[in-house]
Amino acid sequence: MQPGDVFSRDPEIMSGALVFTGTRVPVDVLFESLLGGSSLDEILEDFPSIGRERAEAALRLAQRSLHSAAA
């Protein structure tokens, strides 16, 4: 999945916050919920529009970004 398939930003949607593409769910919800102790299954239960494939792709993209930053 390409980043544009996972997240997008549009000034008309959630005041331009980074959201999961095709939703109004901010990407921060995923990371803040994980940091708060929620499991991925719990997050997807609360925000089913994210979808498992997109959530896992977001985590992989974040991981790659960290590896690139550390290189």
Each model region followed by its residue ranges:
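Intrinsically disordered, low-complexity and often Lys/Arg-enriched segments
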Residues: 1-3, 70-71
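A short, structured beta-strand/loop element
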Residues: 2-42
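Long, charge-rich, low-complexity alpha-helical segments
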Residues: 25-71
